[in-house]
């Protein structure tokens, strides 16, 4: 409020002088009216801000730092991500750090470890982390013999919280992040683990749609710090030294990678949201709530496990009610049972409130993004389910840039061509009474899905 007083100093002085001329019998009500006027002005001032500046302010209050010197290159499909990342690793000179939920024991992981082994021979330090539950739940896990072979090639690889009997207590607080940092100069993050189904698809769901991004700029250091903190937690080893952190500009050896061709390349505002179960457990949930509540015109949302909690449902309904165009895209296919029934139940309810819902048909859309007012977006590992919002280690890049946001919005528009729009008619044709009942039952279990 002090800033408001300073910006309206002459008017405020006039109000104060008037107050002292006011009869004592009416002075209390006069003060109340003045306070109400100031509060209204403050709210108007906040509303006049763009949703992008508001979200930055809100995230800074939660401890997120933003920098303005970043480039962000979107890697829209699996082939593009792995081609770009593998080429970057081939040019590594100092260190390669990888943190994934899982490395599926298939052709892509095999190629990755071969490339990493070659870099080790050239003196590059390679450190890799994977989650025990992610590996345990994988239909092609890394077995002890595989891990032994990888280590024999000089790659330091460790498992976070291996699953041991009784395993039921070990399903929470897992490391679901996907981070790669190369030479402390460039970083990758997004929704993909290391698996060939991001390229080949699977028999169960068909094509597997997902995306990643490459970051160059100050936020590479943030991602490096996240990795090194987890490395110490898992191994007990503290890694320090300037060589692990970025000194701009990006070395010429990485010029062969796909460039950020937008007008704001090298000038993008980016912040990294890092969710840790015991220190920042509500940060991603609060980001989504604030992003939805701050929206003034348009929300586009893609998420594979759209089970939501009550507050997120309420926020989306309120956004629709105040005239925000809300577009949601979810997949017809899924890799797990019951959860999609809950997802379909939720989007149908939101469709009836006025949301525009698209059901993606060709395969499984595993992407986790939101675009707000054409001004900011996020790419990362967090789903909109209980696991990501309440329990697991997660990480999302918040990109405050209209150009990158438009790139994602354009992708959303293209994906509409492979989707059908949910209406009451298409809902009744698609979902049998039994499936509707299963969806209702599944939504009761959403705190556990």
Regions inferred by a protein language model and the residue ranges of each:
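Bacterial Sec-dependent N-terminal signal peptides
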Residues: 1-51
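Charged, low-complexity intrinsically disordered terminal segments
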Residues: 8, 41, 45-449
């Amino acid at each position: 409020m002090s800033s408001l007083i300073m910006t309206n100093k002459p008017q405020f002085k006039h109000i104060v002088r008037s107050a002292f001329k006011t009869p004592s019998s009416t002075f209390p009500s006069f003060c109340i009216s003045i306070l109400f006027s100031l509060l209204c002005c403050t709210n108007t001032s906040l509303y006049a801000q763009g949703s992008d500046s508001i979200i930055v302010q809100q995230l800074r209050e939660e401890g997120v730092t933003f920098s303005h010197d970043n480039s962000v290159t979107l890697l829209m499909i699996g082939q593009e991500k792995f081609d770009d990342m593998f080429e970057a690793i081939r040019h590594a000179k100092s260190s390669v750090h990888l943190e994934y939920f899982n490395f599926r024991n298939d052709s892509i992981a095999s190629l990755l470890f071969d490339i990493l082994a070659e870099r080790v021979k050239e003196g590059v330090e390679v450190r890799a982390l994977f989650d025990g539950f992610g590996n345990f739940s994988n239909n092609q896990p890394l077995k002890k013999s595989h891990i032994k072979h990888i280590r024999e090639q000089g790659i330091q690889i460790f498992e976070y919280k291996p699953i041991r009997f009784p395993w039921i207590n070990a399903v929470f607080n897992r490391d679901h992040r996907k981070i790669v940092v190369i030479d402390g100069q460039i970083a990758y993050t997004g929704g993909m683990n290391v698996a060939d189904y991001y390229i080949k698809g699977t028999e169960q769901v068909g094509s597997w749609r997902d995306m990643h991004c490459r970051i160059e700029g100050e936020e590479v250091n943030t991602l490096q710090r996240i990795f090194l903190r987890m490395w110490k937690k898992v191994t007990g080893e503290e890694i320090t030294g300037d060589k692990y952190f970025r000194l701009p500009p990006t070395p010429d050896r990485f010029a062969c990678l796909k460039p950020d061709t937008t007008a704001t390349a090298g000038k993008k505002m980016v912040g990294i949201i890092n969710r840790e179960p015991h220190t920042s457990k509500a940060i991603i949930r609060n980001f989504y709530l604030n992003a939805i509540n701050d929206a003034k015109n348009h929300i586009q949302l893609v998420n594979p496990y759209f089970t939501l909690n009550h507050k997120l449902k309420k926020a989306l309904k309120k956004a629709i009610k105040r005239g925000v165009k809300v577009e949601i895209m979810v997949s017809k296919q899924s890799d797990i049972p019951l959860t999609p029934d809950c997802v379909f139940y939720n989007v149908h309810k939101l469709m009836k409130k006025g949301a525009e819902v698209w059901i993606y048909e060709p395969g499984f859309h595993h992407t986790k993004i939101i675009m707000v007012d054409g001004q900011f977006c996020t790419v990362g590992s967090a789903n909109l389910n209980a696991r990501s919002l309440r329990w697991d280690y997660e990480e999302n890049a918040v990109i405050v840039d209209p150009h990158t946001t438009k790139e994602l919005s354009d992708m959303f528009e293209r994906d509409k061509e492979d989707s059908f729009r949910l209406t009451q008619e298409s809902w009744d044709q698609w979902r049998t009474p039994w499936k509707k009942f299963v969806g209702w039952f599944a939504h009761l279990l959403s705190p556990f899905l």
